[in-house]
């Protein structure tokens, strides 16, 4: 994955502000060069995506702004998120056009198994459970109650997003330190029958 693009990823979580709006602004080479209107549009788009009600831990959204054009990137567990994100951004003042490049992940029973097993491994771990919004007990409850239903996922402010496609896992989001990043990768690789794990987590600075 291109490092520049990934560092412009948008994550919906409590630590989002710590990314300092690291959203790609193709019209300028530095924050100082950004116009006020572009900054305002960027903030408004970010808020619009944050408010999507069905954006969960198995999704990941990002965007870039070039004048009045917003390009959406990322992965959607359900196709409805792709269309909902585009509709929400189109309503933002200052947005003239939306290029929707969000990829809808293919339906797969095996991928679902990997998603939930990875979720359980990470968010109930003694070391990483502080990232679970409701703590490890809430994560255990969600895994036990909803994993059996196709298309279900935990919604909310989960900092570590779990993207699974064709048996391969990619971790995206923001963590506090390198130790947490390493541990999350280890927990993802510990899931049975996963073909590989890409650890693209960003360490908070």
How would you label these PLM feature ranges?
Residues 2-19, 25-205:
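N-terminal targeting leaders
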């Amino acid at each position: 994955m291109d490092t520049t693009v990934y560092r412009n990823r948008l994550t919906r979580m409590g630590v989002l502000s710590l990314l300092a709006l690291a959203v790609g602004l193709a019209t300028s080479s530095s924050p100082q060069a950004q116009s006020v209107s572009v900054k305002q549009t960027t903030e408004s788009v970010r808020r619009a995506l944050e408010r999507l009600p069905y954006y969960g831990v198995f999704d990941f959204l990002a965007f870039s702004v070039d004048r009045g054009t917003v390009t959406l990137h990322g992965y959607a567990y359900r196709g409805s998120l792709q269309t909902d994100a585009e509709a929400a951004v189109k309503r933002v003042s200052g947005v003239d056009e939306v290029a929707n490049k969000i990829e809808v992940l293919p339906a797969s029973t095996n991928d679902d198994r990997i998603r939930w097993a990875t979720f359980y491994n990470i968010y109930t771990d003694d070391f990483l459970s502080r990232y679970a919004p409701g703590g490890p007990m809430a994560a255990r409850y969600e895994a036990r109650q909803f994993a059996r239903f196709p298309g279900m996922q935990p919604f909310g402010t989960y900092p570590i997003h779990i993207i699974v496609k064709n048996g391969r896992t990619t971790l995206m989001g923001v963590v506090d330190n390198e130790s947490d990043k390493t541990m999350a990768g280890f927990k993802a690789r510990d899931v049975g029958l996963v073909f590989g794990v890409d650890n693209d987590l960003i360490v908070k600075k």
